[in-house]
Amino acid sequence: MCGVSIRRQGGHLFVRRTVAGIGVVAMIVGMPSMATEAQAAQKSCESAGLSSSIESSGQQYALISDVRINYGDEAEPEEYSSLAYAKVMGSGWNLGNSFDSVGTDLSEPDQGEVSWGNPQVTKELIRSVKSKGFTSIRIPMTAYRRYTEVVDAATGTTKTVLDEQWLERYREVVDWAVDEGLHVMIDIHHDSWLWAKNWNGDTNAAEYIRFSDLWKQMASYFADEPELVSFETLNEPQFSQGDAQEKLNALNKAAYDIIRATPGNEQRMIVIPTVETAYGDDRLKATRDFIQKDLHNDPYVMATVHYYSEWVYSANLGITGFDEDLYGGSQPYNPRNSMENFFQRVNAVFTTSGIGTVIGEYGLLAYDSASDNALQAGEEQKYYEYMGHMAREHGIAAMFWDNGSGIDRNDADYSWKKPLAGDVIQASTTGRSSYATGLDTVYIENRPDADISIPLALNGNSFIGIDGLTEGGEYTYDSQQSAVVLKADYLASVFDARKGNGLLADLTLRFSAGAPWHEYVMKSGVPTVDADRLAAGTRENGLDIALDFAGNEFKSITTYQNGNKVGPNSGWWKYLQNGSAVVVHDNTADHSLGSVTLTPSFFADATVQDGQITLEITFQSGKILELTVEISNGVARVQTTI
């Protein structure tokens, strides 16, 4: 086991690395990554031999050497502010659903870090995170079921004590990340909704005392960690009743005071969440005011929010395009605009006030949907690409939420489960990627007799070429319009080579920097119900509707009864949620045979009555399939295809 201790005192940085089990404490020379160029230019190093030793747990350790790194005579608080810290945290990754996972069935034993199905965390996984270009990692931790309540017989007071073995294992993984040079954010995670939300505001209440006890132990246990390690007080704080902001301020102040009073944490970076880590102006401003007034504008305090984009796009309620209008208002507003608005808000409230920000979680909610391709692949990649760009532009740290559906933790190589999305996420840690301004698929119904132009968003890069094709042959490149032009003869040749509907070509477009872009050429026909595979369903179990997608990718579905929209959210929205009220199975590159399933949650909605329901299914190609479902006495059947 090894640990690194870094201390900053009087303009000096002291670095110590401890290697246990071999009888030696080895000292290393190093500089934390937050050092500015000016600091680096002023640094000087000194080494002095030590002829002493220490004993810990009955084992002797020889002190080989000590190191001093001098940045100069000036103190660094302004240079080492939370703004600078956020910049060097940069692009991060969440070790989600591991140490934060917990079984809530108290009749079953706690399974620890594997409670929600992810395998035990390995050092190789942490190394792979670093190798993928991430510079920070968030390691969420749920304390619930990992502590005991100890009652003092004399006073009758109760003290919460975290399990020592649990803490040791948690710290082991934290130290693996530190050893890789990653900035590490630790926190108290699902406790926010498991018990902390029930706090009534009384500082004598069990929730407040428990929260304080947890941070007393955490602050002490991790006090000798280097400044790479930051403390996030509470994940997504929420409260069942009362003034949520007032309660959160009280908990944040309690954690802050405990951390600062614990030796070794005088300049520890403390991360303060907004209520529910939301980013409405009221939430942002309340947190800014708390940091400025209650925490006296401590330069070693950051703010944190989470960003999952607009729900109707993120969770796929029929809006699948990153540049697709969301709400149909007089002024178009799309997910790209939403992201820009988010960063503008954070910048205006936190950054301009000198407060650094970390987006502790970002992603799209349908990433691990029950539906195949619930997120349109190319449009999902555009979201990640722009997220990385905007975070870098604003000097804000951004940490991708991965609950196990991102990096494959059961794969020896720790590859991405969605390789193309992973490529873009990795590329976005350092720069921009290029892509088609439109959809990642060209749909062709009839034999082409004209060229097809694919406009590109280069984002500062240069177009290099298409794998396996020759510029001037199968395609040309219009540099003035930044567009690839697929020649009619080439399109006709691949069209003729395929008898049925499906994928004609997977074109890999490469650029001077960033991830490659895949543009698919698809032969598409008319989607139909596959009568041979139809079967009746029920309200209780749902209805599977077998389809021949005919080379078309599903986009959205609207359901009507007696001329009115029905189904979950139909009172305010026009489409069903893909992965919830409807589940789509179409996992082939050809978009051939598959199914659309109306789930039990659809039939359970009060708006869905017995009788005929019309389904309007829209595909990315623009084609629409209408069919009728008859519901009677709990049984549902497909009746008509138009």
Residue ranges and their predicted role:
Residues 369-467, 485, 500-518, 526-535, ...:
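Aromatic-rich peripheral "rim/lid" segments of glycoside hydrolase catalytic domains that contact
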